[in-house]
C-alpha cells in the first residue's frame, strides 16, 4: 500500500490547525511547522506542513520536494512573496523566507541529513540544488 502524501498532508494540516498545534507538530523526532504562503498565481493563502530544523533565532526548511527535479510549489510561492506565517507547535509568528547563503549551506545540510536521513537521500538524488530556506521571525503573534 503506497501512501498518498498529498492526502496525508491535507489531513495532517487539518489536525495541526484544529488542535492549535498540540497535535501534528512532530513526526517522530522531527519538528513540523505549518507554513502559510500566498499563492503566486491565485493570491490565495496556501498552507502546508513542512519538516523544520532549528536555525539561528527561528527555523529552516528544505525545499527538497522528495528529491524531485522541480522545486515544491510552496517554495515558488515564497520566492514570489517571502512574507509567510508560521505555526510551530502552539506558537504562531510572521516570518520572511530567505534562502540560506551558500557559505552556510553545506554545514547546515550536514546537520539536517544527520537529523533526517530522508533529507540526505533527497540531496543525493535531486538533479538540482535544493534550497534551504530560513524562515526569519519578523515578530511574535501570541
Name each region found by the language model.
Residues 65-119, 124-129, 138-139:
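Short, structured beta-strand-loop surface elements
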Residues 1-26:
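Extreme N-terminal tail/first-helix region
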Residues 1-2, 139-142:
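Basic/polar N-terminal segments that are highly enriched at the extreme N-terminus
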Residues 22-23, 42, 119-123:
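Short helix-to-loop capping/linker segments positioned immediately adjacent to catalytic or ligand/cofactor-binding
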Residues 1-9, 37-39, 83-92:
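N-terminal short leaders/motifs
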Residues 134-136:
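Short, well-ordered beta-strand micro-motif
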Residues 30-66:
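Short beta-strand segments
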Residues 32, 129-132:
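Short hydrophobic/aromatic beta-strand or adjacent loop that forms the aromatic wall/cage
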